[in-house]
Design a protein with these regions (language model features):
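Canonical Rossmann dinucleotide-binding motif of NAD(H)/NADP(H)-dependent dehydrogenases/reductases
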Residues: 6-40
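Substrate-binding pocket helix/loop in short-chain dehydrogenase/reductase
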Residues: 104-131, 233
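Active-site helix of classical SDR
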Residues: 145, 180
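Short, small/polar-rich loop/turn modules that mediate ligand/substrate recognition or access, typified
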Residues: 156, 196, 201, 263-265
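Residue(s) in the substrate-gating loop at a strand-loop-helix junction
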Residues: 164
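Active-site loop-to-helix junction immediately N-terminal to the catalytic Tyr of the SDR YXXXK motif
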Residues: 170-178, 187-192, 218
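C-terminal substrate-recognition "lid" of short-chain dehydrogenase/reductases
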Residues: 241-271, 276
Length: 281
């Protein structure tokens, strides 16, 4: 009987995880460390990154915390130099930095002409807010890949971008975020083609609804009761619940395992409890 290919051994690998201080990406960092990789936890918040690195070290793993602004070429180049010096050349890049901004959202789900001037509509979107969201998701992914993937070319590497089910089915109220994540998915496919002959695979994970520090206030009120938005989300999610961060790691590890997914590149994989498959009828 042939040996199963799904043996996740990342010993000797160096992994860089951006947004590593957050709920989802800290789970990614801990998972790859558990499989033997040396991990650079990058975050704009040094303390958040250090907390994750310390937790990895407490479990016997090897990790460093690196403060980095994924929208600054200078900051990223400095971070890349630090990772190279302290851990070695990266083999894995997880582009997890991203997010939304209130100035890129509307108050209404559909336009009521009578409400113009009464609530924040499409016509009130702040261009700087929209641009910030596009930068934070799309440009951060592009710039971070430029900083860390150059030395992968020719020696092999694995890039995992974090998209969203918004990229498949845009949600109401958040046009900037939905558009930005669609751009990340498109960039993932473009990079997969571009890097294919250089031995670098590029894929993306598209999470559905997971409770994070960024969206908690939108999903629950101050008493911890689910908001109306949460009720609508769960009705549209066939599994009827939010995902847990650990439920993303199986897909992550499959994509990182060359024996199991070595012919997989350019994919955007939803992990969303069926949200993107549900028509609502």
């Amino acid at each position: 009987m042939a040996k199963l290919p799904f043996d996740i051994d990342l010993k000797g690998k160096v992994a860089v995880v951006t947004g590593g201080g957050g709920v989802l990406c800290s789970a990614f960092a801990k998972t790859v460390a558990q499989c033997g990789a040396k991990v650079a936890v990058l975050d704009l918040n040094q303390d958040a990154a250090q907390k994750v690195a310390d937790e990895i070290a407490a479990e016997g793993g090897e990790a460093i915390a690196v403060a980095a602004d994924c929208l600054s070429v200078e900051s990223l180049q400095k971070a890349a130099g630090e990772v190279e010096k302290r851990l070695g050349t990266p083999d894995i890049l997880i582009n997890g930095a991203g997010g939304n901004h209130p100035r890129g959202t509307t108050d209404d789900e559909q336009l009521d002409p009578a409400a113009i001037g009464q609530v924040k509509t499409f016509f009130d979107l702040d261009p700087s807010g929209v641009q910030f969201v596009l930068n934070l998701n799309y440009m951060a992914t592009l710039l971070t890949t430029q900083a860390f993937a150059k030395n992968m070319a020719g020696r092999g590497g694995n890039i995992i971008n974090i998209s969203s089910m918004n990229a498949f089915r845009p949600l109401t109220k958040i046009p900037a975020y939905s558009g930005a994540k669609a751009a990340v998915s498109n960039l993932t496919q473009w990079m997969a083609v571009y890097f294919a002959k250089a031995g670098v695979r590029v894929n993306a994970i598209a999470p559905g609804f997971f409770v994070t520090n960024q969206n908690r206030a939108l999903l629950f009120d101050e008493s911890g009761k689910p908001t109306a938005r949460t009720d609508k989300i769960l009705r549209a999610t066939p599994m009827g619940r939010f995902g847990e961060a650990e439920e993303l790691t199986g897909t992550l590890l499959w994509l990182l395992c060359d024996a199991a997914s070595g012919f997989v590149t350019g994919t955007v994989i939803p992990v969303d409890g069926g949200f993107s498959a549900y028509s609502g009828v």
